A protein has these predicted regions:
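Short, basic, glycine/proline-bearing loop/turn elements
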Residues: 33-43, 109, 134-137
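EF-Ts-like protein-protein interaction surfaces
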Residues: 191-201, 205, 228-241
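Short, amphipathic alpha-helical interaction segments embedded in low-complexity terminal/linker regions
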Residues: 212-298
Length: 298
């Protein structure tokens, strides 16, 4: 294996003397390199949009979004998955993050797990992965066996397969139905893909899950109307969302939320249409959970 041909493993000439720099110069240089990430992700907008549409369509049909990755890439997938239930009230099994080596690998590296191609497929089998689901394989280098094993298995099931890597021409790119390949260049510390590559992957994952949830009607304007208020901060956010969406005062928003079990969507429809809880629920159901349509704005 020639790692020199992999962009994420190449040496960054701009940071070759970073160990001799002052702390301020070092930090500024890292920041300058990080600025390349957003542009690299932006260059993949068309592919990201295609992936969002596929994910939203499959979730609407009862499929699941499954991330597969190793190390940093795997942890980023897990992070994105676990944030979906509180943010968008998704079922915990609707967006799933799989990491080579299992849950222990989230906190401590499991040596050799990423090199097991069969394990990638086996982890999909364990969750009953099928044709309605979508797999997103995440690997900075684009060559990780665990991820490729998962991607190949998913393709055999007839599922949509999306690949995220930071190395053009990689095996992940070739295996994916939709390849997303932001290329921010060699890392500040050679081969440390938790840095620019990891940031690029996190940005892409944000777009995939957020974009899909917006397409599914879980956002009204730019308000998080499907938030699950599981703590004090989120309860207050829920109240502010209803106030922002309807123009009512804090007490009126609180009263409406208490009537409908703190479901912001239902409270907004109630207040905007003068309906009771049951009628608001029916309006939302008739319009696939989209608040704008439920209140007659679109």
């Amino acid at each position: 294996m020639d790692l020199n041909s992999i962009k994420t493993e190449q040496r960054n000439s701009r940071t070759a003397q970073i160990d001799t720099m002052s702390t301020l110069s070092m930090v500024k240089l890292i920041s300058e390199e990080d600025k390349k990430v957003a542009a690299a992700v932006g260059a993949e907008a068309e592919h990201i949009a295609q992936a969002v549409d596929v994910i939203a369509a499959q979730l609407k049909q009862g499929g699941r979004l499954v991330y597969s990755g190793c190390g940093t890439s795997g942890r980023l997938g897990v992070l994105d998955a676990v944030e979906c239930p509180p943010t968008y009230s998704t079922d915990p099994g609707e967006v799933i993050g799989l990491i080579a080596g299992g849950n222990e690998a989230i906190f401590r590296a499991k040596e050799g797990a990423e090199d097991d191609e069969a394990l990638g497929a086996e982890d999909l089998k364990k969750i009953g992965f099928g044709s309605k689901d979508v797999l997103v394989g995440i690997a900075a280098s684009g060559r990780t066996p665990y991820v490729l094993g998962a991607m190949n298995y998913a393709r055999k099931q007839g599922a949509h397969v999306i690949g995220i890597s930071c190395n053009p021409g990689s095996q992940v790119e070739k295996t994916a139905e939709i390849a997303i390949t932001p290329t921010p260049g060699p890392e500040v510390v050679t081969g440390s893909t938790r840095m620019k590559s990891g940031t690029a992957q996190k940005m892409v994952l944000n777009m995939l899950s957020t974009g899909a949830m917006i397409k599914l009607g879980k956002v009204y304007g730019n308000l998080m109307v499907d938030v699950k208020p599981t703590n004090a901060k989120l309860v207050e956010r829920c109240k502010r969302i209803v106030c922002e969406a309807t123009g009512v005062d804090y007490d009126t928003a609180t009263e409406a939320l208490e009537k409908c079990g703190y479901r912001a969507k239902v409270a907004i429809v109630m207040l905007k249409t003068g309906s009771d809880v049951h009628e608001a629920e029916q309006r939302l159901e008739a319009h696939e959970g989209r608040v704008a349509q439920a209140v007659g704005e679109n």
